[in-house]
């Protein structure tokens, strides 16, 4: 609770004094100041939420620091750090992203090895329940519903879980996406790049050799991570995707969709659907490859099955546009002709 003197007595007779409250504990500010039910109620003049850097802003920062990274390497750093300026400030000049990963996560010095626990401890007075939620969500790429989380965490107090989820969402660690139509329910998904990178490669890893990322970790494992992380990168830059599609001025709703596998049907998942007011739906497939991405016959058949499964939900009257988001574009072949829109990494760097 805010101190009584601040709420009712401090500077009450001074019209030229402003109180500026700032901090990284977004949920605390929302609960105690913006939604204050006491003396601060309805007294907030201006709200200014500071968002993480976008790829465009990270590129400007990299250029300012003379790090000499191309866009693919900037994107790889973003997939590990997100847009948190502090993490970017730790990148050593004259070192590649791979060398920086070695030093910050796997070197003999602590670097960012202790950051995970310190991060949540700095934001939340009692970090344990928040970390439990993060760890649980980290095991499910598509996310979990509130009821699923409650069952897995064996939490009896549903109201408290709701508050924890709201706090994590306010702080940008998780997102809640609604089912197609956006009526009821919702799924919580971990989207914090640093937490996901830490949980996949650093947590429980005793390596202090300083070359784990470049020498000991297989390229296949890294590419698997890049594929998943690139999808999150796209989810964090939907306005840029809309701009590249030429629909910045069109009202849209953004969804994800999944269908669990049963004995009768295959499981299916689409991470990004852009539902447009003009009646079209961009079904986005996000594919990471260091060169041009080639749509193979088997890959195209998988995409077709996803489209047909999704069409069963929305009905035949809606128009679905297959949209491919890749790093360097699509390799020309017969299957490329069935793609209605192409987005490349450069498009995600738009302001």
Language-model segments: which ranges?
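A cross-kingdom feature that marks ATP-driven nucleic-acid transaction machinery
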Residues: 180, 186-351
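Phosphate-binding site recognition
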Residues: 1-215, 220, 322
């Amino acid at each position: 609770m805010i101190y009584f003197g601040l709420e009712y007595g401090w500077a009450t007779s001074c019209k030229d004094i402003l109180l500026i409250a700032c901090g990284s504990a977004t949920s605390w500010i929302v609960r105690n100041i913006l939604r204050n039910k006491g003396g601060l109620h309805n007294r907030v003049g201006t709200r200014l939420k500071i968002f993480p850097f976008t790829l465009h802003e990270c590129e400007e920062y990299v250029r300012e620091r003379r790090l000499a990274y191309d866009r693919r390497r900037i994107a790889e750093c973003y997939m590990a750090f997100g847009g948190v300026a502090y993490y970017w400030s730790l990148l050593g000049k004259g070192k590649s992203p791979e060398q920086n990963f070695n030093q910050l996560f796997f070197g003999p010095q602590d670097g960012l090895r202790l950051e995970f626990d310190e991060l949540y401890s700095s934001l939340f007075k009692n970090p344990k329940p928040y970390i439990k939620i993060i760890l649980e969500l980290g095991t499910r790429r598509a996310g979990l519903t509130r009821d699923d989380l409650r069952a897995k965490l064996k939490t009896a107090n549903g109201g408290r879980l709701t508050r924890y989820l709201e706090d994590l969402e306010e702080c940008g660690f998780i997102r809640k996406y609604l089912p197609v139509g956006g009526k009821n329910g919702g799924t919580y998904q971990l989207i914090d790049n640093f937490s996901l990178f830490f949980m996949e490669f650093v947590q429980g890893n005793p390596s202090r050799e300083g070359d784990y990322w470049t020498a000991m970790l297989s390229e296949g494992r890294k590419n698997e991570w890049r594929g998943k992380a690139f999808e999150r990168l796209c989810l964090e830059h939907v306005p840029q995707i809309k701009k590249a599609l030429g629909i910045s001025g069109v009202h849209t709703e953004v969804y994800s969709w999944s269908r669990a596998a049963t004995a009768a049907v295959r499981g299916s998942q689409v991470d990004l659907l852009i539902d447009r007011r003009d009646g079209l739906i961009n079904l986005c497939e996000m594919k990471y490859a260091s060169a041009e991405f080639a749509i193979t016959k088997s890959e195209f058949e998988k995409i077709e099955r996803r489209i047909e499964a999704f069409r069963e939900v929305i009905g035949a009257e809606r128009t679905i546009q297959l949209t491919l988001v890749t790093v360097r574009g699509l390799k020309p072949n017969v299957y490329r002709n069935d793609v209605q829109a192409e987005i490349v990494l450069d498009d995600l760097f738009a302001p």
